[in-house]
Amino acid sequence: GFCSNSDKFYYATNRIIGTVIGIIVGVLVNYFISSPNVWEDFILSARSCYRSSNLVLKQILFGEKVDLSEFNRELASATKLYKLLEKEADTPFQYRYKKISREKRIMSLIESISVRLEVVENMNADHFSFEVSQEALKRYDLEEEYSSDLDVEDRVYNYHIEYILKYMDQLKEEIENIKVK
């Protein structure tokens, strides 16, 4: 049978409205359902990085065998999630992520901690500086004599440890007050 022109028009309009509604619903579903998870996963992942870097640093300071594998797994996961966040920040309708400056800070702190952990893990330093021995005591109940006469390697080692501690404090500050479901 032949459709009248008004039927065709009605059908076409319906299809267009249906498509537009479908697109809007799709965008909203994506916005409200998939997006927050990437962000939450990133924050949780950053917290795991913090915990495992803390563990690694403790191993280093106590002179134990250092195992970076868990930290590196967490780092890889945080990096992957951060890249997804960056992608989401570039898509339209993502007002929530327009400024991922805090996430960028978190990621760069984790990366800085990572680099320095790699460095000190491979060093054979014998002595703590006064600052590092104080921090080791405060944070890990580690009583370690400090030396005021440090050789070059000890100085470099302590320098990196101090930075790791500083970055870890900054990281903790960034992530601990974020509300995640």
Task: Kindly label every feature range from the protein language model.
Residues 98-108:
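All-alpha amphipathic helical-bundle segments outside canonical DNA-binding/catalytic cores
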